[in-house]
């Protein structure tokens, strides 16, 4: 009996000491930012981290998901977060905070890794205690955990709203709801202003950034009193997420072509949405080149693109690479695909593909679609050799 009592007492003391150590780590970081939402959290986390680093903060950023990373102000090397076999656990945030403090940082920008509403509360109130909260968006996802309605998802995200701090949000149907919650917590609300994010600025990124992503990060800069010039420069210097959709300037600094790497967006809807966004930003899309990578073991996908994607992109030239291109050749010959010219490079080598491509790179968009594996991977590496170095000033 006494052994049980002593064991319980020891566990209690250890728990109290651990909590005190963690609170000491939290208190050692005057700037703590919690990025929550459904889509775009990793991008906003990276852009915000870039801003703080540019402004002179010793900042550590942390992204979550399948490729969770630690980002540091004092080295370009990112550290993958190694997880236990059971997967992500919000308790890892304690180790993140400890490492951040021991490294000498004075700011942390952390993507919220909790989905369950109760865990979101624990993440904010016990593990991070952010004084700046960011809610990227309220969309339908994880409905089984946070739903079943958008209203309940919005309610779950109120855990991100700090007390006596700042909340950065986009203007949405939940703006007034979040503002009321923030008022109850004596927190100032900053509405992200997309009018400050021009298409010309977005084209400077080598990956796809949406206006909301940049304006939310700019809102964090406003909360910290960081000037916009520093903020814009910091975002451009922020390293992209490994899974970011890359847009590379090619050949000429004055009239570059742009390679849009959409090979990994291997479904019709995503591929068309990317193309729509590329046009909206203002890239030279009047006479694009579409590169379709086909795979012998993905003939169903090739057929889907022949029916549901390529007919809806007016291309100057369509280049087919990889294997089993016949479904698209047939659709083109039947007049279903509005491309002015077709180049069927089935089974051709990367060098042979580049021989055709490099003469066509100036001042136009080259959009790679279909499949990332197979012929696309070595081609992407080769295209990178023609990348124009972006100057950030």
Swiss-Prot record:
The keyword tRNA processing does not apply. Changing residue 89 to S: In strain: IFO 3336. One of its GO terms (molecular function) is ATP binding. Catalyzes the biosynthesis of PGA (gamma-polyglutamic acid) from L-glutamate. Both the 44-kDa and the 33-kDa forms are required for PGA synthesis. It holds the Pfam family Mur_ligase_M. InterPro entries: Capsule_biosynth_CapB, Mur-like_cat_sf, Mur_ligase_cen, MurCDEF_pg_biosynth. This is PGA synthase CapB. Changing residue 139 to F: In strain: Asahikawa. Its EC number is 6.3.2.-. The gene is capB. The lineage of its organism: Bacteria, Bacillati, Bacillota, Bacilli, Bacillales. Disruption phenotype: Cells do not produce PGA. It comes from Bacillus subtilis (strain 168). Gene3D superfamilies: Mur-like, catalytic domain. PANTHER family: PGA SYNTHASE CAPB, UDP-N-ACETYLMURAMATE--L-ALANINE LIGASE-RELATED. Keywords: Ligase. One of its GO terms (cellular component) is membrane. GO terms for biological process: capsule polysaccharide biosynthetic process.
